[in-house]
Structures are given as C-alpha cells and as structure tokens.
Amino acid sequence: MNWDQVEGNWKQLKGKAKQKWGKFTDDELDVLSGKKDELVGKLQEKYGMAKDKAEQEAELWREAC
C-alpha cells in the first residue's frame, strides 16, 4: 500500500495506527489523515524520535498495512 492509498483508506487504518502508537489521541489521528509528513512529525513530537527513525517507523507501518 502506498501513501496515497493510506490517505484514501485512513478511516479504516487509523485503528491500526492507534494500536501501534497508543500515545496518539483519536483527535490527533483524525488530523493526521494518513499523511506521511504529518505522521512523521507527530511521531517525533509524541515519542521523541529523530526524523529518520520516525520516517522508518512510518514506512514499516505502511508496509504492514
């Protein structure tokens, strides 16, 4: 699944994101809307990840979807 597909199916996928990253609130997940850059930024903010680590986490999650 590519990022365009993630965005298009975000309502179905945000539950998986919530399971993976439990610190995200439902409102934060709604705002992310499946956008990679938004997700990476939120991972950096909530989990204190470096940008490259957050990008890697986002990609691994996308590939598992």
What are these regions (language model features)?
Residues 1-65:
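Intrinsically disordered, low-complexity, hydrophilic segments
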